[in-house]
């Protein structure tokens, strides 16, 4: 496994990469000196390369390749537009890596894409998914076989980071086969849809499938959606609005994720 450290007072230009081989207990150290200040967000390593997503002081999102042997630095300018950011990066094999990119469109909707590159930074292929009048908040793509890929993630209203449902997309030979979306209220037992927990007007909207008209007194913030074997594991937290602070509202989490208890 690999560990990356940022050198103190280096203006985010100097890092230390430690590669640990668990089989041989061999530890290798490499000093990384970047030509520009870059806050490294996520990274993967190959034999002589470290490939990482980063952001600079102008808040531009970058995708970079750095050779730890000859210190050569490559910024893949053509791979990202100003409205795009990398939210995931992984190694496919010894010659190919993959990034998941979230793009904000002019109409304030978001789309998600999966892009594969060779080690020279050349884009090999790309697939993307979007939902009309909706924003994709997060997601990932899973290879089923040599020609089938499934994309799964969370979506919300346009220009919103609050998830309102889950989407499932299927690609055959890199072409969209189908796209389905499900509001959380359509999922069995996601919410307790009875009068003990929900107001009558909300239950009526659920019955009529007027999901976009439902308004809660809390925000619903997704944390992660991951695939484990044949199951999807979803974690999130709710933030309750409090209007009892001099007519100004503050956010109060009613579930403390650190203590594992509900706040009073």
Task: Give, region by region, the residue ranges found by the protein language model.
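Karyopherin-beta/Importin-beta family HEAT-repeat alpha-solenoid scaffold
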Residues: 89, 111-115, 171, 176-190, ...
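Surface-exposed loop and turn segments in beta-propeller and other repeat-based domains
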Residues: 32-34, 78-81, 128-133, 178-215, ...
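Signature of short aromatic-glycine-proline-rich micro-motifs recurring in repeat-based ectodomains
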Residues: 137-141, 199-230
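Beta-propeller blade signature
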Residues: 14-24, 63-70, 110-122, 163-176, ...
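Glycine- and small hydrophobic-rich membrane-insertion segments that are intrinsically disordered
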Residues: 238-264
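Repeated scaffold domains used in trafficking and secretory/extracellular systems
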Residues: 34-45, 82-92, 133-143
């Amino acid at each position: 496994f690999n560990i990356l450290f940022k050198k103190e007072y280096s203006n985010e230009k100097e890092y230390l990469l430690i590669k640990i081989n668990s089989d041989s207990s061999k530890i290798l150290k490499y000093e990384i000196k970047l030509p520009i200040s870059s806050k490294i967000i996520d990274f993967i390593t190959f034999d002589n390369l470290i490939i990482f997503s980063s952001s600079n002081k102008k808040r531009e999102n970058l995708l970079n390749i750095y050779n730890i042997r000859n210190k050569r630095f490559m910024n893949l300018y053509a791979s990202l537009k100003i409205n795009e950011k990398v939210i995931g990066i992984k190694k496919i094999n010894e010659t190919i890596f993959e990034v998941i990119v979230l793009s904000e469109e002019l109409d304030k909707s978001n789309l998600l894409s999966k892009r594969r590159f060779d080690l020279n930074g050349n884009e090999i292929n790309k697939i993307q998914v979007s939902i009309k009048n909706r924003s994709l908040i997060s997601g990932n793509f899973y290879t089923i076989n040599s020609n089938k890929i499934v994309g799964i993630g969370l979506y919300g209203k346009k220009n919103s980071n609050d998830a309102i449902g889950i989407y499932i997309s299927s690609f055959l030979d890199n072409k969209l086969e189908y796209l389905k979306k499900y509001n959380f209220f359509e999922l069995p037992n996601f919410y307790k849809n009875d009068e003990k927990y929900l107001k009558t007007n909300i239950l009526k909207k659920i019955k009529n499938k007027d999901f976009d008209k439902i308004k809660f007194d809390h925000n619903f913030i997704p944390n992660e959606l991951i695939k484990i074997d044949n199951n999807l594991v979803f974690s999130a937290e709710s933030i309750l609005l409090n209007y009892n602070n001099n007519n100004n509202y503050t956010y109060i989490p009613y579930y403390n994720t650190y203590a594992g208890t509900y706040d009073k």
